[in-house]
Amino acid sequence: MRNRFDRQLEELNEMLIHMGELCETAIEEATGALEGHDIARAKAVITADSEIDQMEKEIENLCLKLLLQQQPVARDLRRISASLKMITDMERIGDQTADIADIVIATKSTEEKNLKDINRMAEATVKMVRDSVSAYVQKDLELARSVMAADDEVDDLFDLVKGDLVKFISDHKGNAGDEAIDLIMIAKYLERIGDHATNIAEWVIFSITGNHPG
């Protein structure tokens, strides 16, 4: 019985890794579409969001099956419960990459000089998502805590982007100002993705220690 349960937990780990990879790719593709104003790439991000949604359903079903059929002990119960929370945040990450893609499709162009720090935000959030899922699979408390610390960097970058773009808006009128507002929205979505990665890390800590740091 325990061997079967362990195999199912391993399956859960693999599914979470795959869902995390989908989220990482979605962030990279959405910001890549922004940089090149690639409409086809942006549309592919929106399509890929449905795969993330489907992964959420499949993982949720497996977690519920484990809870109902296996009667897990406290440690395993925490891991399964944390997984259910984590996939909610990953699904929202998928939604926010689709929101970024929607903005790319709706806009005519972007001010390239404003994209450097947005790209840095994207790189930081991809790493946060990757590290949060790795921390869960490896039961790595320090890695989870490093994700939480990294959120400060993303927040600082958002403040930097917003400040630069607000100044740009005050100095320009018309379409250029509208495009700057779109970039602020994209930066805000990336900041929220960082928040979701932090939530995942907090649930990892709960799964290991039994205490939620939030």
Locations of regions flagged by a protein language model:
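Cytosolic, long alpha-helical scaffolding segments
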Residues: 1-214
